[in-house]
Amino acid sequence: MPLRLHDTRSRGLREFQPADPPRVTMYVCGATVQAPPHIGHLRSGLVFDVLVRWLAVHGYDVVFCRNVTDIDDKILRVAAAEGIPWWQVAYRNYRLFDSAYRLLGCVPPTVEPWATGHIPQIIALIRRLIDAGHAYPAGGDVYFAVRSFPAYGGLSGRDPDALQAGESDGVHKRDPLDFALWKGAKPGEPSWESPWGPGRPGWHIECSAMSTTYLGSTFDIHGGGLDLLFPHHENECAQSQAAGDGFARYWLHNGLVTLRGEKMSKSLGNVLSMDQLLELVRPIELRYYLIGAHYRSTLDFSEESLEEAAAAYRRIEGFLLRAQELVGELPAADPQTGLIDRLPPEFVAALDDDLAVPRALAVMHSVVRQGNAALAETDKTAVRRFLGEVTAMLDVMGLRPPDDGSRLDALRRVVDNLARLVLDEREAARQRRDFATADALRARLTDAGIVVEDTPSGPRWHLRDLDLP
């Protein structure tokens, strides 16, 4: 089955066919860096990380552009409140975003443009819109004339006549629906020279200029959170196509993260930061959790569901540990190219069906259960095969345990040392002929998942099948 993705514009699944295979061009709206990342940002970053990885498995050469919005009304408000330069706010929070993405195992973008580094390209695009009759200067600002573009609203499915006015600060607008491409300078705010006087770019025009600068006038995929669909992506699409660009061929949007059914927002005081989440689980377990729901669905966060996901991931780790104990080192991390032929067909079918990660994870756990059954039979050949499949699936989704074998070796040594302490105490009890204590210690180990075998050369232990139904 070919790869199919849900295209927001067509409101249905479409077979993915890049314009210039094997090259795939993809733009994802990155962070507006006025604050540290929260769980919603992290989910969006991980959704498109899985897509980048899966496209690579299909043999595509992905050019992935993710922007940084480093000048914005919100950034300026934070800077004013803290009494520091706007760029200091932007850079401080960018570093937190970058650290979070790296900690969660995201593939770095091919290019990561910053808005303020592309003022000439933004000005050039605004000039094209004015020349085409789709934008107009007014009072030092420049606005996009929404009603000059009849297709406006097509991406998000909105009727312009039913829309409310957008930006309230545009006193020079000809129409309440028009939005700013360029904002005239205000006292105390940063500004750049332009044909319309000093000022700074509007949010929407930044993304249009940066995406087409690096990916061309028409590119394959535009992604972002569902909260960006309107007005941001609608405005991007309208101004870009009004300027004569084909712009994005496929639009993908990930669902939001809620808390007890309520959208997370700073104003409600219910956002969850990276630091808060990492007090509960490890980064790899957080990654497993955030990609575990289908990307287009709403993810309603709870500590219980996070803990369940972490436990599910630890079951996979338990299999890896026991399999490594039997057959040796884990297989080396597999390069993405050519990997598709070594994955279970059901796993491939799941990800080809609009990145159905929940189904793909179900396949992985099924293989883990088969692997645990093979371990119980000490079938090295079968264990090695299942181990290869599981590690290949983990590699595809960026879920291989950190530090690979070295981490498992360290964990194995810790468990071995603890088991030996108890076994030494058990042996001392047996020497004293205190068999009740010896049996109780063995039972304690069994309850902890450690099976003890008494052999002529002394007691040996192995981990019981820790996979839960």
Curated annotation (Swiss-Prot):
**GO terms of molecular function:** ATP binding; cysteine-tRNA ligase activity; zinc ion binding
Enzyme class, first EC level, given as a word: ligase
Position of motif 'KMSKS' region?
Answer: 263-267
Q: From what superkingdom does this record's organism come?
A: Bacteria
Q: Which residues bind Zn(2+)?
A: C29, C207, H232, E236
Q: Which UniProt keywords apply?
A: Aminoacyl-tRNA synthetase, ATP-binding, Cytoplasm, Ligase, Metal-binding, Nucleotide-binding, Protein biosynthesis, Zinc
Question: What's an example GO cellular component term for this entry?
Answer: cytosol
Catalytic activity, EC = 6.1.1.16
Per the UniProt entry, what is one GO biological process? Answer: cysteinyl-tRNA aminoacylation
Listed binding positions for ATP are K266
Paste the cofactor note.
Answer: Binds 1 zinc ion per subunit.
Q: Which reaction does it catalyse?
A: tRNA(Cys) + L-cysteine + ATP = L-cysteinyl-tRNA(Cys) + AMP + diphosphate
Provide the protein's localization.
Answer: Cytoplasm
As cofactor, the record names:
Zn(2+)
Q: Where is this motif: 'HIGH' region?
A: 31-41
CDD domains linked to this entry: CysRS_core
Q: Which family does it belong to?
A: Belongs to the class-I aminoacyl-tRNA synthetase family.
Q: Which HAMAP family does the UniProt record give?
A: Cys_tRNA_synth (MF_00041)
Summarize the subunit comment: Monomer.
Protein name according to UniProt? Cysteine--tRNA ligase
Q: Which organism is it from?
A: Acidothermus cellulolyticus (strain ATCC 43068 / DSM 8971 / 11B)
